[in-house]
Amino acid sequence: MKSVITTTISAADAAGRFPSSSDLESIQGNIQRAAARLEAAQKLSGNHEAVVKEAGDACFAKYSYLKNAGEAGDSPEKINKCYRDIDHYMRLINYSLVVGGTGPVDEWGIAGSREVYRALNLPGSAYIAAFTFTRDRLCVPRDMSSQAGVEFTSALDYVINSLC
């Protein structure tokens, strides 16, 4: 799983060198942000059901046609799968916050998702709308500290940009 630490160490090892001062500064910055990432992960874990429901509701509010016959959400089963997918991505975001890198999202979420969505006639824009709603809904300090909010929105932005 990729993180700033494992990526930095791997690059130094591949070059047959010790990590440079700038490598170590990057790792130190990552470690200093760890408390904020863990706070964001804890807040998401503690409230994930509401976050997923609100994100899914926002998706279907923006793209109400998805519930029409022949569309991606034309049955309760398909609608539940959309919420399940949003929950899956939120878990991956949580894991990424914990490890301090995008590895979980890259390895278990993004790889191949665009192709799967196209094959199943699922518009990626609907998922983007769900994650954008979650990002824009965040209220500091109501939901989490400002630094935790920065970490959470960065993780959401990574997913949003990866799905574009």
From Swiss-Prot:
Report the PTM annotation: Contains two covalently linked phycoerythrobilin chromophores.
InterPro entries on file: Globin-like_sf, Phycobilisome_asu/bsu, Phycobilisome_asu/bsu_sf
Q: Which UniProt keywords apply?
A: Antenna complex, Bile pigment, Chloroplast, Chromophore, Electron transport, Membrane, Photosynthesis, Phycobilisome, Plastid, Thylakoid, Transport
Q: GO biological process: any one?
A: photosynthesis
Tell me the lineage of the source organism: Eukaryota, Rhodophyta, Florideophyceae, Rhodymeniophycidae, Ceramiales
Q: What topology does it adopt in the membrane?
A: Peripheral membrane protein
Something else the entry says is: The light-harvesting antenna system in red algae and cyanobacteria is formed of phycobilisomes. These are composed of the phycobiliproteins phycoerythrin (CPE), phycocyanin (CPC) and allophycocyanin (APC). Cyanobacteria also contain phycoerythrocyanin (PCC). The phycobiliproteins all share the same subunit composition and organization with variations in the covalently bound open-chain tetrapyrrole chromophores.
What protein family does this chain belong to?
A: Belongs to the phycobiliprotein family.
Q: Source gene?
A: cpeA
Positions contributing to (2R,3E)-phycoerythrobilin 2 binding: 47, 137, 139, 142
| Protein's cellular compartments | Plastid, Chloroplast thylakoid membrane
The role this protein plays is: Light-harvesting photosynthetic tetrapyrrole chromophore-protein from the phycobiliprotein complex.
Record's subunit section = Heterododecamer of 6 alpha and 6 beta chains. The basic functional unit of phycobiliproteins is a ring-shaped hexamer formed from two back-to-back trimers contacting via the alpha chain subunits. The trimers are composed of alpha/beta subunit heterodimers arranged around a three-fold axis of symmetry. The phycoerythrins also contain a gamma subunit which is located in the center of the hexamer.
Say where the protein is mainly found. plastid
**Organism of provenance:** Griffithsia monilis
User: Pfam families under this entry?
Assistant: Phycobilisome
- Which residues are (2R,3E)-phycoerythrobilin 1-binding? 81-82, 84, 88
Q: Output a single Gene Ontology CC term carried by this record.
A: phycobilisome
Identification of the protein by name: R-phycoerythrin alpha chain
Note whether Transport occurs among the keywords.
Answer: yes
